[in-house]
């Protein structure tokens, strides 16, 4: 596993520690972001850093496949690199529509992918309309929902305290 992006930022909880705690083997890590700036300019510089660093790492690792999940710039970079290096690219959650820049990144990633795991039939049909071969598209559901389903119940009092919630007031959960 290569760790980068927001996993290495303090403002997002330096979640590389969670990855380590969960027992995943980390081959290497690198910082994509050149500043704490969330501007479009910083996003493009970060993407450039991902291309440069991941191409070096993937060349050295020589993986059998490149897994490019979701709609994140680093995953788009890995899909571009994998395709250029003739390594099969697997993309998760292609064909989704959000109406944001993420949608464009997701669709572009899908075009570099060879195998697609979609969350639903509509997303699969969208990929087929984009020219992807239906025999390489598999509807597998949403792994995030599976993860939520398998979460152990947390006492309400703990949730209220940890996240500073008041369940006497209306609460909306967005996933």
Identify the meaning behind each predicted range.
Residues 21-25, 84, 132-134, 167:
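Short, well-ordered coil/turn elements that cap or connect secondary structure elements
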Residues 23, 28, 34, 76, ...:
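Solvent-exposed, flexible loop/coil residues
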Residues 7-13, 113-175:
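A nucleotide-sugar donor-handling region in carbohydrate enzymes
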Residues 2-4, 92, 175:
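Short hydrophobic segments within beta-strands
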Residues 2-46, 53:
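Conserved nucleotide-sugar phosphate-binding/catalytic loop shared by glycosyltransferases and other
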Residues 26-29, 89, 136-139:
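Conserved beta-strand scaffold positions in the cores of enzyme catalytic domains, especially
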Residues 32-133:
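Active-site and donor-binding regions of nucleotide-sugar-utilizing enzymes
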Residues 17, 99, 145:
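Short, electropositive, low-hydrophobicity segments enriched in small/polar residues
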């Amino acid at each position: 596993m290569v760790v980068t992006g927001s996993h290495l930022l303090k403002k997002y909880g330096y979640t590389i520690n969670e990855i380590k705690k969960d027992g995943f083997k980390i081959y290497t890590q690198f910082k994509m972001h050149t500043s704490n700036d969330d501007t479009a300019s910083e996003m493009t510089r970060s993407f450039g850093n991902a291309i440069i660093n991941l191409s070096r790492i993937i060349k050295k690792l020589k993986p059998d496949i490149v897994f490019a999940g979701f709609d994140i710039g680093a995953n788009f970079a890995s899909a571009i690199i994998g395709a250029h290096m003739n390594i099969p690219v697997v993309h998760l959650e292609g064909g989704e529509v959000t109406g944001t820049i993420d949608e464009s990144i997701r669709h572009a990633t899908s075009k570099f992918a060879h195998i697609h795991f979609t969350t639903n039939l509509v997303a699969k049909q969208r990929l087929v309309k984009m020219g992807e071969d239906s025999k390489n598209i598999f509807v597998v559901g949403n792994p995030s929902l599976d993860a939520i389903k398998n979460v152990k119940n947390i006492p309400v009092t703990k949730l209220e305290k940890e996240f500073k919630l008041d369940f006497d007031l209306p609460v909306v959960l967005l996933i």
